[in-house]
Amino acid sequence: MKIYYLFFVLIYLIYFINLVYCEKNDTSIILDDILDIQHNRKLFPKITHQDIENIRQIRRMNLHSIVKSMSTLNVQDLGLGIFAGLEKSVNPNPNECIDSLRTSIDNTNQVFYDISNFFGITIQEFLTLIQIFPTIIKDDIRLYDACGANVIVMKIGKFAHIIRTEGLQSFANYAKNALYSNPFYLIPVTRGLLESLVTKNYQMLGVHIGEYLGILFNSDDD
């Protein structure tokens, strides 16, 4: 019985030595993961074994090769995903925004239609249209500012100013602090990004990258 027990222990030791010395890279990755998790326990209180496995798989990937192997369709999917994720983060109610915009555009189109049929309406009706026309245009501009790219472009300009005046490292520190200060949004976005990268779902990968950017944009409101 003791010999059997010693044999079992010997097998276990051989396995452990092989794991440490022959697969040193994998072991160091696992240890790094554990240290990272311990260090970021407050930030990631609900981290799972699947998250750890995704991180390990991503660390083994050659991301440069993945980028080089992306097809034109993959790049398009990534771009569409980034746009969708950014729109989702910057504007949390896109359907409501788009519906309001569509209603305003319909109203504007109706004004143009009525003016083009000027002789079919009375002078008083035309004067009324002229009076409300500036208001409709103003509402359109307001909605375009809220739903369109103007807000995004302005904030990209602010980030570019940080990089130009303070350097890339300062922007990286700013981005890290901005992301870490939003753990409620950061955790599910990070989890989705890891899963999308492992499965090579480029459109969803783009969505999560866009959500990351949205977190940065939303944190820059001062």
From Swiss-Prot:
Predominant location: secreted
Protein name: Secreted protein D
Key word Membrane present: no
Subcellular location(s) of the protein: Secreted
Glycosylation sites: 25
Gene this protein is translated from: sctD
Keyword Signal: yes
Record keywords: Glycoprotein, Secreted, Signal
Family of this protein: Belongs to the Sct family.
Signal peptide range in chain numbering: 1-22
GO cellular component assignments: extracellular region
Highest taxon in the source lineage: Eukaryota
